């Protein structure tokens, strides 16, 4: 899914741009919130009002930051855990002047865990906002585990949004949220290998590449490398 509008803002070379990446945690993560799969207490947001307040806060952060490109993860469009608030629609009421793409990367059946407060059924995805015109967008499915964790990893993917640059090249915006819970090294390596191969292919074509998102693990044990 993507949206366009008439006011086209060209992306130019030799200009500094601001980039923001933000896992918004389905609108649940307040200061004292802890998620059950991280060893915490909760599986859902506190209530509908808190979800709406948190998402409005995310919109304020984006507007106040005035980033040119924004990568968001865990944006629910319909979920038990977020009280069926369509967070994409709510964000778009606050965030103006952007083109955007949405790529669904989570579509779970009704999960009966934890037993005291089931996580429920949820649909969520990746949202990419761009001041420059997005002329092409692609969703790429990632390999996932065959273990029980596949029920929390359904439809893992990354999105590629392409923005024309004034020199004829493309700016390729990669938005990613890799597997976290129970994933094997083989799954992690497969996901990163696929992502890096696509990024390199775009780079080798002479395009510009920016990747933002939640990798769920350190990409390098030695940051200097």
Mark where each language-model region is.
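Beta-strand-turn-beta hairpins that frame and shape the catalytic cleft
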Residues: 9-19, 122, 126-136, 152-175
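Surface-exposed cleft-lining segments at the edges of enzyme active sites
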Residues: 41-47, 75-77, 142-150, 177-186
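Active-site metal-binding loops of divalent metal-dependent hydrolases
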Residues: 24, 75, 176-178, 213-215
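Metal-dependent phosphoesterases centered on the DNase I-like endonuclease/exonuclease/phosphatase
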Residues: 183, 187-225
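N-terminal, active-site-proximal structural segment of metallo-dependent hydrolase catalytic domains
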Residues: 1-94, 99-117, 123
């Amino acid at each position: 899914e993507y949206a366009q509008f008439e006011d086209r803002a060209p992306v130019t070379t030799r200009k500094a741009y601001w980039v923001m990446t933000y896992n918004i945690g389905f609108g649940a993560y307040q200061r004292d919130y802890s998620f059950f799969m991280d060893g915490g207490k909760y599986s859902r947001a506190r209530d509908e009002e808190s979800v709406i307040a948190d998402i409005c806060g995310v919109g304020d952060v984006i507007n106040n930051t005035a980033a040119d490109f924004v990568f968001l993860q865990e944006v629910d469009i319909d979920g038990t855990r977020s009280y069926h608030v369509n967070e994409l629609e709510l964000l778009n009421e606050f965030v103006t002047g952007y083109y955007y793409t949405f790529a669904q990367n989570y579509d779970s059946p009704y999960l009966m865990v934890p037993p005291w407060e089931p996580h429920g059924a949820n649909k969520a995805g990746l949202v990419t906002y761009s001041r420059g015109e997005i002329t092409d967008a692609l969703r790429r499915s990632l390999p996932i585990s065959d273990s029980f964790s596949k029920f929390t990893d359904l439809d893992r993917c990354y999105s590629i949004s392409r923005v024309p640059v004034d020199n004829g090249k493309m700016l390729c915006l990669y938005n990613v949220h890799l597997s976290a819970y129970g994933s094997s090294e083989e799954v992690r390596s497969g996901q990163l290998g696929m992502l890096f191969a696509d990024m390199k292919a775009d780079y080798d074509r002479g395009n510009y590449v920016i990747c933002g998102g939640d990798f769920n693990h350190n990409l390098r044990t030695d940051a200097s490398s």
